[in-house]
């Protein structure tokens, strides 16, 4: 009986995670199960990195386009994409939107994908970025700062 009680929440979590992954594929255009994600907090902000097999030229181009697009959207204070992927307002985004003029979002290509470097000297913005990245790590089931294959 206890195993049935425990299995129900796990099934709901797995179902919720699959739904998150499906929304992520819709938003990003690539299968997150075949990609590596990082959400790294840094003293002056953080970084979001997404890479896949570098021989998949179309997938790499799609990742780079997505990261470029979110760097521009985030700079404008627009966080609809993470809201859609996670099915809710993502922690930190409200402050990041208000303090958008104090935060830089810089896209860099990487082998197999790219990264968005998030840079600020504003302490409230740094805390918000760290909240945003911590939520991303939790919801995407990324352990610490290690690269994670979904």
Describe each model-derived feature in a short phrase.
Residues 1-7:
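Bacterial N-terminal signal peptides
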Residues 12-150:
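Intrinsically disordered, low-complexity terminal tails/loops enriched in metal-binding residues
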